[in-house]
Amino acid sequence: MAMTAREAAWTALQRWRKNGAWSDAALHAVLQNAQLEPRDAALAARICYGTLQNLTLLDHYLSVYCTTPLQKLEPKVLDLLRLSAYQIVLLDKIPPRAAVNEAVALCRKGGCARASGLVNAVLRRVAEHRDALPEIPGAGTADYLAVRYSHPRWLAQRYIDAHGYAFAEQALAANNADAPACLQVNTLKTTADALMASLHADGIEAEPHPWLPDALLCHGGNLADARAFADGWFYVQDA
């Protein structure tokens, strides 16, 4: 059976955790073997990077709804809970039911079938409360910022001490915001200039990467709907 976008993201997260690989290297290695359609590859990348960006926040929510302490879960089960909670809480376009159902299916397929009941129960609770998630304690403190923006507490405190709480929150929020998409040109099929022209024709802002050759930075627009995406003219990478 072909690998799905969520399965690719889960596999990449496990590779990242086990091998200490950079997230882009872990994902690239998985996507090379998965042979996903461009739209699914983009979804896998979004889930993988988004989960890693929000680990502390996701763990906060999961710990509320999971009766087993997170540190006692099998690591790959925790990986699956995290990426599924990310989809439910932070990705508006994915129906929560779809995220829950595929997580259970992946749990069974991925060699941790005994945890499928726990995965189902925890994610259903997250989905039921997605519009009223538990508050993060410590409002107005470094503890709050560390959880809300998934940054080390010491960094949040340093920003507060140096510039005040408002600046600290703005800085951490900006650092955790989605960066422009970095596209690696598939030079076997096109050139950077031709790709940029094609993206512009589809209403997607793009510009040459300041230091990477044969790469573009994209701001806004739906890359999955671009003609160049369907034609395999580029790969999304972390840069």
Residue ranges and their predicted role:
Residues 230-239:
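Conserved SAM-binding loop and adjacent beta-strand
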Residues 1-228:
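Class I Rossmann-like S-adenosyl-L-methionine
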